[in-house]
Amino acid sequence: MGNSVMEKIKGGLVVSCQALEDEPLHSAFIMSKMALAAVQGGAVGIRANTAKDIRAIQSEIDVPIIGIYKKDYDDSDVFITPTLKEVREICETGVEIVAMDATTRKRPHNEDLKDILNAIRKEFPNTLFMADTGSIEDVYYADSLGFDLIGTTLYGYTEETANKNISDDDFSHLKEVLKSTKRPVIAEGKIDSPSKARQVLTLGCYAVVVGGAVTRPQEITTRFTNEIKKI
């Protein structure tokens, strides 16, 4: 399955369809229709949060899905598919790719990422695993653990990389990531325009994930209203 999945997303746009509990569009049904609309617009894949949303989306579309499970724990800042329990739950949906926080930060219950990956590969040998990284150190860490894909998802969202943008200094961080690993790199995080999406692919990324700029109406509307307020 791995090679065929990778071919399907190569050079394309993956759309992240997520709405958290405190957001107006929080609904598995709505996310499934959002995913369908994205695929009709040319998306080659979908990134989705929670088994419930994933199963609803699977009933609507037939493109690869990157599955995650966002869950907060009191003893850790790691929240993207943070423990073996969440990783297993997402794998059980049958998604082609499962993404998880692959930073060097302490995980909930002091679980070890290497142990999680080793255990889950035995249970789901055909599933691909994507590392959501923040820093270059995270990239080296994820690479050493044997992740199938490296994502820049958490760049700008960890304490170490706070307030940074993937396009800063002419995409310098992304360029360093591409030099630091031979694994396919998925550009993700603050890619909020078509031109940015094109640029990251031109630089050599395997695929690009775009979320808020496509699927969060409140964010899109705010960009317009903020600009109008400048009048």
From Swiss-Prot:
Keyword Isomerase: yes
One annotated GO biological process: N-acetylmannosamine catabolic process
InterPro entries: Aldolase_TIM, NanE, RibuloseP-bd_barrel
Sample GO molecular function, one term: N-acylglucosamine-6-phosphate 2-epimerase activity
Domain of life: Bacteria
GO cellular component, as recorded: cytosol
Annotated keywords: Carbohydrate metabolism, Isomerase
EC numbers for this chain: 5.1.3.9
HAMAP family registered for this protein in UniProt: ManNAc6P_epimer
Family: Belongs to the NanE family.
Name of the protein this chain belongs to: Putative N-acetylmannosamine-6-phosphate 2-epimerase
